[in-house]
Every structure is written in C-alpha cells, then in structure tokens.
From Swiss-Prot:
Secretion signal span: none
Keywords linked to the UniProt accession: Endonuclease, Hydrolase, Nuclease, Restriction system
Organism encoding this protein: Nostoc sp. (strain PCC 7120 / SAG 25.82 / UTEX 2576)
Keyword Nuclease assigned: yes
UniProt-listed InterPro entries: Restr_endonucII_AvaI/BsoBI_hel (IPR043091), Restrct_endonuc-II-like (IPR011335), Restrct_endonuc_II_AvaI/BsoBI (IPR015277)
Name of the protein in question: Type II restriction enzyme AvaI
Gene: avaIR
CDD domains: BsoBI-like (cd22315)
Length: 315
C-alpha cells in the first residue's frame, strides 16, 4: 500500500488552515504577476496619447489601434474576425460614448477602459490558475524525485511542443513543462498533463505511459495497454469549492476504472488535491483502504507529495 508511507489516517489528508491562507497568498501573487504587463501597457498608453488634444485624433494613431480596440471592449480573438471598417466603427463608438463625454479627462478614461477590458481578460486566464500552479508544483516534485535517483530525463516544452534534453540548470523549467520522460531500471516511462484518453472519452489531468517520449502519438494513446497510471490533480485552494473539485475528480477516476475494466486492465489511479475537507478526506481514505484508489496526497503537504512522486517514478 504505497499511501501508507505518508498517510496514517484520514486526518493527514485534511488541508490545515495555515495552508489555505498560504494558498490564497500564492494566488494573489500570481494575479499580480500576470497583471504586471497590462499595467505597464496602460502606462505606455497614457504617455503615448497624452500628446493629443482631442479624442478624435486617436483615429489617426494606427500604431496603437490594437490597444484602442481593446479599450473599446473588442477581444484579441474577436479583432481577428473584424474588417478594417468594423474596427474603426468600434473605436469611434468608444470615442463618442465614453471619451468625448469625459472632456479634458479623456486620456484617463481611455486608460480606465483599457484596464477594464484587460481585467476581464486577466479574470478569464485566472480561472484555472490554481490548476496551473498545481501542475508546476507537481512537476517540480517529479523532477526532484528523478534527480534524487540520479535518473536523467527529457521534458516536453508546452510552448514549442517539442521534447528537450534535461538542462544543466532546470530553474523555472516547470513554468513551461507539459510532460517528462525517463528510463529507470530498464523501464521507459513518459508522463503528460491533460491527455484526452480515448477509451475514457475525457481529459485526464495526469497520465503515465509505458513508452519512450518519441513514441507518444495518437495511435499509442488509443492503446489502453500503454497506460500505467492515471491521476487527477486539483489545485484550487478555496475550501468552499473543495467538495466540487473532489466530485469532479472522483467521477473522472470512476470512469477511468470502468473504461479500463472493460479491457480487463487495472492501471493505478491516484488523487492529489490542495483543498481537502474532512468529509472528503474520509471518503478518500476509505477508497485507499478498499483498494479503489491506489494513492493520494495533499498538495500542500510536501512530505506527502514527495512520497507519492517517489512511488510514481518507480512504477
């Protein structure tokens, strides 16, 4: 029972209050980090337009048209579908409805409108920030486990979508990492985040495959025999949403077991979560003791995650 190395009771799985508080602070810091480019753009916009005397002059400033469109409430995606005249109409609407009524304060109003739209953009990107931070943290623990066992690895860059060799300096590698591949004691293993598993017909947070990284392709992913372990990773820290996160994860794990059982297969299943309440912990503990769930860990507890990742790379 691999979970017994780091969990002795259901109470061990419950997220302590101080970790909830630390989690909210981490989310706030990430929001500020992501907001910084928008704030700097707003400052640059204010300096750029401070030289004009009236809002209508903005129509002649073609170099900042994308920014003016953003201030008009047009998203980057929507702008790609608009004709040139549509863009002009949107900016004229901004000028007539908001900037001209602001009088001599039209520059401040323009900056405000820009930040308002970018705030919505930021809000959308922040909806899954807990999940993104969780992926980074989990990846760092896997890398640490591999390093500790003196196992070299390749990593999948989510930006270039290419597999790269282990770097000499792996600082912040988790910011761009989508997967890892290694060979330990003659076993080729590759793990990837967010895989749409064909036989489950659902996107699964973590999948561990019995293959090299260069063998990962659609045909391989469709082969149920290639799966070693599948797990759900929930990084949301808000206790109010903890139960819903577990319900979603538990449903996905149940679908995994049912789908693979049809092929007489039983891959390992595990759950890692940041916000785990008492009732959730009791249910997870029951599933572990019953053999329904193979392993679990609270993401806010370093020893638990380190233990689970040490188990993970040995599979």
């Amino acid at each position: 029972m691999p979970y017994q190395y780091h969990i002795q009771s259901n109470d061990d799985l419950v997220t302590p209050y101080q970790e909830v508080r630390a989690g909210f602070v981490a989310l706030a810091l990430e929001r500020n980090r992501k907001a910084t480019p928008f704030v700097e753009q707003a400052r640059a916009l204010k300096i750029r337009v401070s030289q004009i005397e009236r809002p209508q002059d903005l129509l002649q400033m073609r170099d900042i048209r994308p920014t003016l469109l953003a201030a008009s409430g047009v998203s980057d995606k929507a702008a790609g579908h608009l004709q040139e005249q549509d863009k002009v109409d949107a900016i004229e609407g901004l000028i007539q409805n908001f900037l001209e009524p602001a009088g001599e304060n039209f520059v401040e109003e323009l900056v405000y409108r820009f930040l308002l739209t970018r705030g919505d953009t930021l809000g959308g990107s922040m909806r899954n920030v807990g999940g993104i931070l969780a992926e980074r943290k989990f990846a760092r623990y896997i890398i640490s486990a591999l390093t500790l066992s003196n196992t070299s690895y390749k990593w999948l860059d989510k930006n270039s979508k290419t597999w790269l060799n282990q770097p000499d300096d792996d600082t912040d590698i988790e910011l761009r990492l989508r997967g890892l591949s290694w060979n330990l004691e003659g076993r080729n293993r590759t793990f990837i985040y967010n895989v749409n598993v064909p036989i489950v017909r659902k996107n699964i947070d973590i999948c561990l495959f019995d293959c090299r990284q260069n063998e990962i392709e659609k045909n391989i992913i469709s082969n149920p025999n290639i799966y070693i372990a599948l797990g759900e990773l929930k990084g949301g820290i808000d206790p109010a949403g903890a139960d819903e996160h577990w319900k979603t994860a538990n449903s996905a794990l149940a679908r995994i077991r049912t789908a693979f059982d049809r092929h007489s297969l039983k891959p390992y299943t595990f759950f890692v979560g940041s916000a785990i309440e008492k009732s959730m912990a009791e249910e997870i503990w029951h599933q572990l003791n019953s053999g329904i769930l193979t392993n679990a860990a609270n993401l806010t507890q370093p020893d638990q995650v380190a233990s689970l990742c040490a188990w993970f790379i040995q599979l």
